[in-house]
Amino acid sequence: MKILFPDFSDITGLPNDDSLLLDQHRMLFFGDAHDWLICQQAMSAQFLDYLQHGLELSVPNLLVTGIDRPYQLHETLQPRQLPQALRSRHQLHLLPLMGNAGAHRFAQALRQAGHAVYVEAPDYATFLQLNQKLGFRAVIAALFGEHKLARGCDLQQPGAAEQLWQTSRATQFVLKPNQSTGGFANQVVAHVGELSAHAAQLQGMDLLEEMIPEVVASLSVHIHVAADGRCTLLPLAEQVMAGPAAANGIAYPVALSAATRAALHADLAVFCGYLASVTYRGNCNLDIVVDAAGRHYFIEANARLAAGAVPRAVLSRLFDGCLPAYRFVERKLPGLHRCQEADVLHASLATLDMGRRSGTLVVQSQKLAFDKLAYVCFGDDAAAVSEQEQGFLNALQQPELAQVA
């Protein structure tokens, strides 16, 4: 069961412009059919236009919430003003509960009745809030404007919001089961509409991560941090692997473009500088992939550093400080890969419903032009969440770890 819950009052970070707000909401009127359209009343003159756009959906039920008494709806919007198509094609329901609480309770009741409720909302914060309260375990930021696809997109241009919506709907993800290695048992989620089925299969600590399309090369950069803090890098050209041979560990030289090489070296310089500043000494290596556009992504840095027994809090600050160099959030230790506080959207979600050790920690870098989104999803299998992983979730509540580096 799919619910569309666009709520004007919950939009954040947008100008106070009615046309822009409506355009933002039109993004939600494309895609899969919904079973319910939930509206919050008190939209005055905008409300009728809002319902008109709702006609683009195949929604059999319209629920209006945020009212003290049912007749309040008709004080603002007289029945004769409702489009004939709306009266004939939709069932109008009134929920005399205030604000979002009404939608929460209604959707929760549906879920308790056995429905797999998936709630869409106009902005990422509301989406997280609604779905987390429902216990939905796979959170997808790619549906909404905070996703990287929205950067530089002028939603006031005709059709811009619709194009953004369609593009984000086409984003593919990979669902990695807990304890998977080498890509074993990974599943490709080709469309966000498939997530409901996948979410029901989550157990323990799984990861849903955005796919990097068209990976053309993978590198392993070895770093040695000397006692005096100096960092030594092995030449990149000697470590590049490409094509099917990369999976077998066979190295072949790959001619990276000058721009890619320069950007990579710049990020490595930032990373190495911060390594030295946190008094890390010894060896580590960073695995890197390069896509067809020449963009590079750092992966699995934590696995290498954790092997060196770097203190957890130090690593957390390390990745905060070298954010421009870090473009991937690893599965096993999400706390280490937090970005700055503004980039950790609703970090408190990590502690949500921890009585059953379920919840979702969402980490997203918003400073990079081409970052990768990853979501650590906790299922209902309490035993699968290790003591170490639980420690990271607890650490997120400590004020000193929530400070912006």
Regions found by a protein language model. Give the residues of each.
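Nucleotide-activated donor-dependent transferases that construct or modify glycoconjugates
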Residues: 1-15
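Histidine-anchored nucleotide/phosphate-binding helix
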Residues: 17-32
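Conserved N-proximal alpha/beta basic substrate-recognition cap immediately N-terminal to
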Residues: 26, 39-151, 159
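Conserved ATP-binding module of the ATP-grasp superfamily
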Residues: 147-150, 172-175, 188-215, 401-404
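A long amphipathic alpha-helix within ATP-dependent nucleotide-binding catalytic cores
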Residues: 211, 246-295, 332-357
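ATP-dependent carboxylate/phosphate-activation module, predominantly the ATP-grasp catalytic core
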Residues: 214-215, 220-273, 279, 302-329
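Peripheral (often C-terminal) accessory segments that flank ATP-dependent C-N-forming ligase machineries
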Residues: 319-405
